[in-house]
């Protein structure tokens, strides 16, 4: 594969599925603030004029679900009926129940260190040295375009923008290295008064150019800005939204495998979330240590069992030390039991709402992005 193209997409915080993710994680954070040992599995559905919050929650905390939901939608920017969705007037339905005692008996143990996994499943983590945050470039820059869209919308630079938007970036590779950007797609909701030519010029100048490195852009790069020409009806009025429906956007943009489990609304006892974060942490430290240029970790668990049922390390032929050394380092320096990874990454804190838009990985504010084990791994592997 001497030459190839690779594409990843992102969506804005105002995309219906991301509204749902943010509400679910806002509920999780509010509960963890009061009760760090709570069991939370919160799902959200949004559609024109309505939000439904459901799931299974066992906690001593009390949270005003309706007000929390409205505040989350308000922060995103849906504050007027002209946008098709209004935080102040939408209906909020609460259908939350309690976690099954059959699950509790497998997770909760007398010795917290032996806490079992909340479910069976497979989780993947990935890192590569393609960007400074050790993430694939296509998803990294797709997210940054969406972050920029939100910034210029909220600070008044482009006041006619609305919250719903999507981006997609296609990178050109030769011999596995980036040589340019082949195509950029950006669709953004807007008010009715802006013309398509004015919108396209403003998006190019205020969103695309400030984000994408000029050395990767050339006269052959193709731009598709609101290619249908009109995007006034958006958000929950245009499409219904559901928690957990943007799992590739949330992770590696398709550049790595995915176990299928979503993240938002789940407390750290759910290994769908916590073990995926731990797998990213392991992979990132391996790459940061110089043990490999690319690394993918797979973990698997059985419900009620503490130790992973399997650990897989894949370095795609880019390893700089023996594969056996890398595997031994993972086993020796990373505690991948549910309790161990919660402690290792300090996961029992209200940090999850911020993860629910613009990706869970490649953002240094999150503990699973630390490379604090890299020096230890280098020493173990004898890397100078």
From Swiss-Prot:
List cofactor names only.
Mg(2+); K(+)
How is the co-factor bound, per the entry? Binds 2 divalent ions per subunit. Binds 1 potassium ion per subunit.
Q: Where does K(+) bind?
A: 43
Q: Where in the cell is it found?
A: Cytoplasm
CDD domains in the record: S-AdoMet_synt
UniProt-annotated binding residues for L-methionine: 56, 99, 239, 270
InterPro entries recorded for this chain?
A: ADOMET_SYNTHASE_CS (IPR022631), S-AdoMet_synt_C (IPR022630), S-AdoMet_synt_central (IPR022629), S-AdoMet_synt_N (IPR022628), S-AdoMet_synthetase (IPR002133), S-AdoMet_synthetase_sfam (IPR022636)
| Cysteine pairings via disulfide bonds | none
Tell me, in one coarse class, where this protein mainly resides.
cytoplasm
Binding annotation for Mg(2+): 17
List the residue ranges of the region (Flexible loop): 99-109
Q: What keywords appear on the UniProt entry?
A: ATP-binding, Cytoplasm, Magnesium, Metal-binding, Nucleotide-binding, One-carbon metabolism, Potassium, Transferase
Positions annotated to bind ATP = 15, 164-166, 230-231, 239, 245-246, 262, 266
Output a single Gene Ontology CC term carried by this record: cytoplasm
UniProt xrefs under SUPFAM superfamilies: S-adenosylmethionine synthetase
User: Where does this protein have coiled-coil stretches?
Assistant: none
EC number(s) given by UniProt: 2.5.1.6
Catalyzed chemical reaction(s)? L-methionine + ATP + H2O = S-adenosyl-L-methionine + phosphate + diphosphate
A Gene Ontology biological process in which this protein takes part is: one-carbon metabolic process
* Family per similarity comment: Belongs to the AdoMet synthase family.
Under the heading PANTHER family, the entry gives:
S-ADENOSYLMETHIONINE SYNTHETASE (PTHR11964)
Subunit:
Homotetramer; dimer of dimers.
Q: What does this protein do?
A: Catalyzes the formation of S-adenosylmethionine (AdoMet) from methionine and ATP. The overall synthetic reaction is composed of two sequential steps, AdoMet formation and the subsequent tripolyphosphate hydrolysis which occurs prior to release of AdoMet from the enzyme.
NCBIfam families the record matches: metK (TIGR01034)
Could you identify this protein by its name? S-adenosylmethionine synthase
| Species of origin | Vibrio vulnificus (strain YJ016)
